[in-house]
Amino acid sequence: MHRMTHYTEIPKAVKIRVWERDGGRCVLCGTTRTVSPNAHYIPRSALGLGIDERNIFCACLRCHNLYDNSPQRRDIKDRLTGYLSWRYGDNWITDEDELKYHKGMDYEIKQYEYQGG
């Protein structure tokens, strides 16, 4: 497996952590139907890390599709930024590059403190 693929895929441990953080609900519409913790804030196509829980969120199929494929992406991303920065506070990113794969770097799965809610 290519190193980039390894780091952009979402490991089970990250999915479990994100599911718990988001309460098993779509963070955009609140539904519990068709929800999974497999949506990237920074998409895989832009080298978004899957091993960093701060880059992953729970979304239903509808909202995930809207985020990935609609002109509403910018507005949805603004909402996600608000949600994730609220959840992580000081552990939120200062630059989106923190959530992207960079060739030659070694990455590990980390757990970040987040606010309950």
Identify the role of each PLM range.
Residues 2-7, 45-57, 65-117:
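Polybasic, low-complexity binding patches
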